[in-house]
From Swiss-Prot:
InterPro entries found in the cross-reference section: Di-copper_centre_dom_sf, Tyrosinase/Hemocyanin, Tyrosinase_Cu-bd
Protein task: Plays a role in melanin biosynthesis. Catalyzes the oxidation of 5,6-dihydroxyindole-2-carboxylic acid (DHICA) into indole-5,6-quinone-2-carboxylic acid. May regulate or influence the type of melanin synthesized. Also to a lower extent, capable of hydroxylating tyrosine and producing melanin.
Family affiliation: Belongs to the tyrosinase family.
Group of enzyme by EC: oxidoreductase
Protein name: 5,6-dihydroxyindole-2-carboxylic acid oxidase
Places the protein is found: Melanosome membrane
Gene assigned in the entry: tyrp1
Residues the entry annotates as binding Zn(2+) B: H367, H371, H394
Pfam families membership: Tyrosinase
């Protein structure tokens, strides 16, 4: 039976010797690291990399592309990935996973030939049992070690240990890996002791890759949880945060945790999430000492929805019409392909522009507004996935993205090919996922290409001027038809009344039976 895991091993590749990327555990042996090849065999046969003998996959060169001039430290982040591995598995057909020994999302079976419905639904519309199951599944993922993934505990120069043969890695849970991956994508580039770290890098925000990066991020968590639960149909639900008002409808003990009665910024002790602890909190230490975020947990989740009285703008959730306005924008993104872009669907759903597309440095809308509304762990970019509301918030953001792709019949050709922020170009590999996956591969409709779909209702679309004219013409024609039909009925009715005033037949008119007795009477 084929494994359904698509997990990878997170190995940091960073400046001056810090390795940062995502690799399978099988690739982080001393021999694997020295070979610079990560093509494990699903059958554990050295002669069968990526299942090439049976056909699931093949070992290919990893294509690296140079960053633009806006990034002066070429080789400091993902470019150093080539030092760790320059070859990876590329799976065929419906096969998937780091060694092509599993199935792609939405498929199962020995040959990955059976489709499995993976339907993401509104979390508020789940039954009580379904809500309980989801909450417990998240908690299980928080505690369960990832079956295929470990993280580096030393920089690249120290990764083989003092004896040059003991690799420096540790286990991490499924959910904490989800948090760690996001932290890495926004972390600064460490340039060495005594130097300020370079902060002009964000692989997952403020650029075209915002939507594609988070889409794959969610796919990895969903797939890991499917494997954990032994259920390939498990789907992450979404939180429709565009409800307006200042109430967090999912902040109940039945779902993501109510507000604590003793501390307005804490989660109720009746919620399982009050016992969760965050990782990747020591940002100053990482940036100044060059240490690595590891699996060590620290403080509890903080959350105070609508509690930021210093910023009234973030005390209310987005409105339903904000989503519809955003969906009506026709351009996916616009120069400079950054948080200052106008008339950009991506920048509007991300929340740096107004829903209608106009850029305003003061505005925070949609995705950004929902994060800031939470007013705590979920409102800090490097920490935000520690609050599990992050999952529901981003699943809805992805649902809006998928609806936009459907409405505008868009394909990857409209995704910027170049001149975007570091890591955001169309054919760039998204950092730090392994095996490598490009932004273009995620710029597709989900149901037809990625193995999952949404059960969602969207606000009615406003009519375009052409549609308004068409409706007016049709309405006028219908009105004429109704008037004509009514006039015809009146004329016909008057005719019937005239006929009703005519005299009855008298005796002067012959009757059949009287005129000819032999005639048949009907």
């Amino acid at each position: 039976m084929l494994r359904t895991s698509c997990g990878g091993m997170l190995l940091l590749v960073h400046a001056l010797g810090l390795v940062r990327a995502q690799f399978p555990r099988a690739c982080v042996t001393p021999e694997g690291l020295r070979s610079a090849q990560c093509c494990p065999s699903p059958s554990a046969l050295e002669s069968d990399p990526c299942g090439a003998l049976a056909g699931p996959g093949r070992c290919v060169d990893v294509r690296m592309r140079a960053h633009g001039p806006q990034y002066p430290y070429e080789g400091a982040t993902t470019r150093a990935l080539a030092r760790a591995s320059s070859r990876a598995c590329r799976c065929n057909g419906n096969f998937g996973g780091f060694d092509c020994g599993g199935c792609a999302h939405g498929f199962t079976g020995d040959a990955c030939e059976q489709r499995v419905p993976v339907v993401r639904r509104n979390v508020m519309q789940l039954s009580a049992d379904e809500k309980r199951f989801f909450v417990n599944a998240l908690d299980q993922a928080k505690r369960a070690p990832h079956p295929d993934t470990v993280i580096a505990t030393r920089r690249y120069s120290e990764i083989l240990g003092p004896d040059n043969s003991t690799t420096q890695f540790e286990n991490i849970s499924i959910y904490n890996l989800f948090v760690w991956t996001h932290y890495y994508s926004v972390s600064k580039t460490f340039l060495g002791a005594g130097q300020d770290s370079f902060g002009g890098v964000d692989f997952s925000h403020e650029g075209p890759g915002f939507l594609t990066w988070h889409r794959y991020h969610l796919l990895q968590l969903e797939r890991d949880m499917q494997v954990m639960l032994g259920d390939p149909s498990f789907a992450l639900p979404y939180w429709d945060f565009a409800i307006g008002g200042s109430e967090c409808d999912i902040c109940t003990d039945e779902l993501m945790g109510a507000r604590s009665s003793s501390d307005s910024s804490s989660i109720s002790s009746n919620s399982i999430f009050s016992r969760w602890r965050v990782i990747c909190e020591s940002v100053e230490e990482y940036d100044t000492l060059g240490t690595i975020c590891n699996s060590s947990e620290s403080s509890p989740i903080r959350r105070n929805p609508a509690g930021n009285t210093a910023r009234p703008m973030v005390q209310r959730l987005p409105e339903p019409q904000d989503v519809e306005a955003c969906l009506e924008l026709t351009a996916f993104d616009s120069p400079p392909f950054y948080s200052t872009s106008s008339d950009s669907f991506r920048n509007s759903i991300e929340g740096y522009s107004a829903p209608q597309g106009n850029y305003d440095p003061v505005v925070r809308s949609l995705h950004n507004l929902a994060h800031l509304f939470l007013n705590g762990t979920g409102g800090q970019t490097h920490l935000s996935p520690n609050d599990p509301i992050f999952v529901l918030l981003h699943t809805f953001t992805d649902a809006v993205f998928d609806e936009w792709l459907r409405r505008h019949a868009s394909d990857a050709s409209i995704y910027p090919l170049e001149n975007t922020p570091i890591g955001h170009n169309r054919e760039f590999n998204m950092v730090p996922f392994w095996p490598p996956v490009t932004n273009a591969e995620m710029f597709v409709t989900a149901a037809e290409n990625l193995g999952y779909s949404y059960e969602a209702e969207w606000p009615a679309r406003p009519l375009t001027p052409t549609q308004i004219v068409t409706v007016a013409v049709v309405a006028a024609l219908l009105l004429v038809a109704i008037i004509f039909a009514a006039s015809t009925c009146v004329v016909h009715l008057r005719g019937n009344r005239t006929e009703g005033r005519q005299p009855l037949l008298g005796d002067q008119y012959q009757r059949y039976e009287d005129h000819n007795k032999t005639q048949s009477v009907v």
